[in-house]
Curated annotation (Swiss-Prot):
Pfam families: Ribosomal_S18 (PF01084). The keyword Cytoplasm does not apply. HAMAP family: Ribosomal_bS18. GO terms for molecular function: small ribosomal subunit rRNA binding; structural constituent of ribosome. Part of the 30S ribosomal subunit. Forms a tight heterodimer with protein bS6. GO terms for biological process: translation. This is Small ribosomal subunit protein bS18. The keyword Membrane does not apply. It comes from the Bacteria. One of its GO terms (cellular component) is cytosolic small ribosomal subunit. It comes from Desulfitobacterium hafniense (strain Y51). Binds as a heterodimer with protein bS6 to the central domain of the 16S rRNA, where it helps stabilize the platform of the 30S subunit.
């Protein structure tokens, strides 16, 4: 029995590293919304393609924006 080998998905490149972004601003909700699902959850690193440093910054920015009501906690 021969096993089928699927193609490995391409490694996504961190968009913040490409643009050489120093820090992610929590007030820039337009940029942050790309990293939230339609249910309001934060996208994981393996899906968003961010590096560890920028994924932490995105997470903190999303949580800050939620706290001051720029972003919703739950999208209905």
């Amino acid at each position: 029995m021969k096993r089928e080998r699927g193609r490995r998905p391409r490694k996504r490149v961190c968009s913040f590293c490409v643009d050489k972004v120093e820090s992610i601003d929590y007030k820039d909700t337009h940029k942050i919304r790309k990293y939230i699902t339609e249910r309001g959850k934060i996208l994981p690193r393996r899906i968003s393609g961010n590096c560890a440093k920028h994924q932490r910054q995105v997470t903190v920015a999303i949580k800050r924006a939620r706290h001051i009501a720029l972003l919703p906690y739950i999208v209905e």
